[in-house]
């Protein structure tokens, strides 16, 4: 069976942690930020982990 190809768009957006979880960046912080509070924009800069519901799907894209 041939090797699975990595989904390049996913590879650029997600990073695997040492424990095998996936890190991602938050959305809604790139533009239209004038109406958002400074606290909200600051919290959007932080990364977070991918939810368990999405892990199986993303694991297939990043073998």
UniProtKB/Swiss-Prot annotation:
SUPFAM superfamilies: L35p-like. Keywords: Ribonucleoprotein, Ribosomal protein. GO terms for cellular component: cytosolic large ribosomal subunit. GO terms for molecular function: structural constituent of ribosome. InterPro entries: Ribosomal_bL35 (IPR001706), Ribosomal_bL35-like (IPR021137), Ribosomal_bL35_CS (IPR018265), Ribosomal_bL35_sf (IPR037229). GO terms for biological process: translation. It comes from the Bacteria. NCBIfam families: rpmI_bact (TIGR00001). Belongs to the bacterial ribosomal protein bL35 family. This is Large ribosomal subunit protein bL35. The lineage of its organism: Bacteria, Bacillati, Bacillota, Tissierellia, Tissierellales.
């Amino acid at each position: 069976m041939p090797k699975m190809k990595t989904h390049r768009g996913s590879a650029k957006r997600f990073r695997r942690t040492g424990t095998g979880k996936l890190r991602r960046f938050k959305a809604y912080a790139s533009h239209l930020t004038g109406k958002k509070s400074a606290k909200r924009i600051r919290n959007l800069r932080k990364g977070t982990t991918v939810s368990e519901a999405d892990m199986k799907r993303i694991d297939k894209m990043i073998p």
